[in-house]
Swiss-Prot record:
Its main location: plastid. It comes from the Eukaryota. InterPro entries: ATP_syn_F0_a_bact/chloroplast (IPR045082), ATP_synth_F0_asu (IPR000568), ATP_synth_F0_asu_AS (IPR023011), F0_ATP_A_sf (IPR035908). This is ATP synthase subunit a, chloroplastic. It is found in: Plastid, Chloroplast thylakoid membrane. PROSITE patterns: ATPASE_A. Belongs to the ATPase A chain family.
Length: 246
């Protein structure tokens, strides 16, 4: 009996161990990659693709079950793009906005719900890909490239006229804004996800039974909000690049 109790407590404490900065490195062409990030990212992507395949396997005129849920999700993501980019030009950008939202949402929830610490790695530990700054910076840079592409594809070289509007005095500030946008996107997402995981780990370490559950529930809500914020801001930046300045 005592051994069973000790085993349960020991398992709970092992789940709450805090390890920051340790990584499983894969060396590819002289580059060191964070292996645990790729593993969890691939699992999240596979889960999203699998869910999409199951949901579109037997499409019906009157949607039911998972098809009905998927159509609701699609309409929700479509509304994000439409509201931020505009009725006329939002459609080509729905796939990107939806992909960003679903990946961040899936990655955040995977990190919050799945007890990755039970899976032992030679180094580091599995966790939400979004608690790695490299992932959030990459996502933010994708958004930056997207709104540059949107502006240039519509306006050509004339897109750069926005840097001197409404007055050339604002040129340095407008240039600086292009650097602060990806910085704010990446650090906001990274900081919130990492802070949530650390708070849950600390609570689980101090009081491993039941007490962390409310914090985990709040973390799931915050994870969903972060996915919404990132995708909404991405759509807003693209919409800003597409709008006509007079």
């Amino acid at each position: 009996m005592y051994q069973d109790s000790f085993y349960i407590l020991n398992s709970a404490f092992s789940l709450s161990e805090i390890e920051v900065g340790a990584h499983l490195y894969w060396e590819v062409a002289g580059l060191k990659l964070h292996g645990q990030v790729f593993i969890v990212s691939w699992l999240v992507i596979a889960a999203l693709i699998g869910f999409a395949l199951v949901g579109t396997k037997d499409l019906k005129q009157a949607p039911q079950g998972i098809q009905n849920f998927m159509e609701y999700v699609y309409e929700f993501l479509q509304d994000i793009a439409k509201n931020q980019i505009g009725e006329e030009e939002y459609r080509p950008w729905v796939p990107y906005i939806a992909t960003v939202f679903l990946f961040i949402f899936g990655a955040n929830w995977a990190g919050a719900l799945i007890p990755w610490k039970l899976i032992q790695l030679p180094e580091g530990e599995l966790a939400a890909p979004t608690n790695d700054i490299n992932v959030t910076v990459a996502l933010a840079l994708l958004t930056s490239l997207s709104y540059f592409y949107a502006g240039l594809s519509k306006k050509g070289i004339g897109y750069f006229a926005r840097y001197v509007q409404p007055t050339p005095i604002l040129l340095p500030i407008n240039i600086l804004e292009d650097f602060t946008k990806p910085l704010s996107l990446s650090f906001r997402l990274f900081g919130n996800v990492l802070a949530d995981e650390l708070v849950v780990s600390v609570f689980a370490l101090l009081v491993p039974i039941l007490i962390p559950l409310p914090v985990m529930t709040l973390g799931l809500f915050a994870s969903s909000v972060q996915a919404l914020i990132f995708s909404t801001l991405s759509a807003a930046y693209i919409g800003e690049a597409l709008e006509d300045h007079h």
